[in-house]
Amino acid sequence: MGAKCCKPVSCGMCKKTENTLIDYKGNPILLANEFTVLTDTESEEEGMADLEKPLLEKVVAKCDTEAEKKLPCKSKK
């Protein structure tokens, strides 16, 4: 419903750009000013994986020791 209402208003007010967003007061919204451009975060994700690895190793070690405590001990004959 909002898109149907805003499109005729934006086409009538600003002929320079076809896809202009208009707020409820009729002012054009420039997305470049409102939001920052997303950058490639691949290197950050790789860095996080390096940080998570030691934590996972600690969790696995803790689970292994708890599992050993629950198992019955085998006696040597």
Curated annotation (Swiss-Prot):
- Return the GO cellular component terms, semicolon-separated: host cell Golgi membrane; host cell plasma membrane; membrane; viral tegument; virion membrane
Query: What Pfam families does the record point to?
Result: U71 (PF17474)
| Mode of membrane association | Lipid-anchor
Q: Name the keywords, alphabetized.
A: Host cell membrane, Host Golgi apparatus, Host membrane, Lipoprotein, Membrane, Myristate, Palmitate, Phosphoprotein, Virion, Virion tegument
User: Could you state what the record's PTM comment says about this protein?
Assistant: Myristoylation and palmitoylation (probably on one or more of the nearby cysteines at the N-terminus) enable membrane-binding and Golgi apparatus-specific targeting and are essential for efficient packaging. Phosphorylated. Phosphorylation does not seem to be required for recycling to the host Golgi apparatus. Packaging is selective for underphosphorylated forms.
Where do we find N-myristoyl glycine lipid attachment? 2
| GO BP: any one term | viral budding from Golgi membrane
Q: Give the subcellular location.
A: Virion tegument; Virion membrane; Host cell membrane; Host Golgi apparatus membrane
Q: Outline what the protein does.
A: Plays an important role in the cytoplasmic envelopment of tegument proteins and capsids during the assembly and egress processes. Also participates in viral entry at the fusion step probably by regulating the core fusion machinery.
Q: Which family does it belong to?
A: Belongs to the herpesviridae cytoplasmic envelopment protein 3 family.
Assembly and interactions?
Interacts with cytoplasmic envelopment protein 2; this interaction is essential for the proper localization of each protein to the assembly complex and thus for the production of infectious virus.
**What name does UniProt use for this protein?**
Cytoplasmic envelopment protein 3
